[in-house]
Amino acid sequence: MATTEYADATTAEDVERGIEGLRRRHPVESAVDEVLSRKRRRRGHDVHNSRSLEEIGKGLNAFLARRLDDPFRVRDLARMPGGASKEQFSFELEWTDQGATRHDQMVLRMNPPASVVETHRVREFQLLRAFDGIVPVPFAYWATQDDAELGEPAMICGLSRGVAAPTKGERTASGIGTVYGPELRTKLAPQFVGHLAAIHTLDPSTVALDAFQVPAVGTTQGVDWQLGRWDRAWEEDSFEPHPTVTLTRQWLWDNRPAIDRISVVHGDYRNGNFLFDEDTSEITAILDWELGYLGDRHHDLAYAMLGAWGHLDDAGRFVCSGIVDAETFIADYERLSGLAVDPERLRYYTVLNMYWAVTACSATGARIAEDRMTHLDVMMNFMGGLGASLIPELNRAITEGA
């Protein structure tokens, strides 16, 4: 059973009481509350039923007709492989933009009834728009959080060219443990670090991010919202308590660092979440902004350095995200960003990242698979094992130096 007293509620009144209880115990940003509450209301009622391309196309045409004044045509609509949370479809749009006829390759990203992480399409849209021209990102065309438009919240963005992993190498699930090789690493590393520095040094007040709440500098507000998010997910989705998770949650609350500078946090910055051109070795797109928020830059740094994403090189050094060794990563980041990296904050966010990964993989993934609310049942079973593998690392991390 899940740990919340309302996890198995069946009446609408019980569900709403449960949501109110979760809100009181675990305050989060309003947009995050919106998507978490939406998932809870649908549990036990909605299951994932794969819709035909004809149905998707009908909804897509109606969606575009509400936004485009001139005639348009959708061509070559197809399901896309990959991804660990959203359904994706590629298509070509023939349309008129500012008087010129265009033929653009686009991607429709749609929520299933529930995901391993619940995220807000308008937030993702705003981040892509904010970083257009600053780092390589797909262009964001339109987004909606209204189920009535396409059946689920959705976003349409440009189709970026490139590959997530070398085509001659072994493909891995969601990019985990991607191996690029020494020559390619040398070319990718400066870009990987440089783009992260550019993300963190953008002043959030200069771009349109009204779907985000801004934490106050000198407080723990930003990390409080993150802990609230993952505590709420664990309480709602886990099947039984786990002593390591209980200890980790307490450690995280007891050791919260106050934020010294507000940065845009990508939230999922690692190998597998960017594309590159195999001929030029140029990073062509940074993807998967859905977990982005305004907070502490150390969150992204610690995440890119997690053991699950990297491997040892021939000299026995750990290669962060399969791209760059930790010492070079930190030194180059500090040089390019002008921002200091605090080892204690890095340790804290390493623990937080492992905690949310355990929650998403071992609790939410298993829960939505059981509830038949995802199109990725097999992937959710795989991710449960990944979450379990992080438990010993969490034990070591919270007892280190204690």
Which residues are covered by each model-predicted region?
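Activation of the activation-loop gatekeeper triad in protein kinase-fold domains
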Residues: 287-292
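All-alpha amphipathic helical-bundle segments outside canonical DNA-binding/catalytic cores
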Residues: 340-352
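Catalytic-loop of the protein kinase fold
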Residues: 264-266, 271
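Juxta-kinase regulatory segment immediately upstream of eukaryotic protein kinase catalytic domains
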Residues: 6-73
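Hydrophobic residue at the +6 position relative to the catalytic HRD Asp in the kinase catalytic loop
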Residues: 274-276
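Conserved protein kinase catalytic-loop anchor
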Residues: 262-264, 284
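Active-site activation/catalytic loop segments of kinase-like enzymes and analogous catalytic loops
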Residues: 299-338, 352-371
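ATP-binding pocket architecture of kinase catalytic cores
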Residues: 75-247, 251, 256-261, 278-280
